[in-house]
Amino acid sequence: MKTAIIYRSKTGFSARYARWLAKILHADLYRYRTVDSDLLASYDTIVYGAGFYCGRLSGCRWFRKISEPLAQQRLFVYATGSMPCVQPRDLQKEWDMSFSRDFQKRLHLFYLPGGMNYAVLNPIDSLLMRVYRRAMLLSPFTAPDTRRLMLRLDRSVSYMDRGAIQPMTRTIYANH
């Protein structure tokens, strides 16, 4: 099974999961936008990982574009986020913002807990996150579990868990 792992990471969480997956799966590791459809055509399995930002997967348009011609490859996508866990209905909303339902049928989708690392965010992203956090805390429509998370996001936090990739690796091996 020839596997390519592609990642896009702003805060390091998606990159760390990508390195773990590459080691376990004996896969080739690539940064976002360093590959194209021609290179990926030689792989059986393609994994793309990135963070959710503002309700969508970072780089989702790019991934959709390069994977469209790859009809024979098995496609896996993981998203990292600042929540330790996500309600399925909320997660589906984010997948729907990222990919059409038809395209989702081609994908095996996974959520991996990431966190927040203010130290590596650029000033604009840091400001946007703080404004978003404040808006969520002030909104009367914010769900209680989201409110609890927003209270914790006043500082850097990590929910990374190496064990979180096990369902994904099992699915990749099972579909080989």
Residue ranges and their predicted role:
Residues 55-176:
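FMN-binding flavodoxin-like domain, especially the glycine-rich phosphate-binding loop
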Residues 1-71, 166-176:
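N-terminal beta1-alpha1-beta2 submodule of the flavodoxin-like/Rossmannoid cofactor-binding fold
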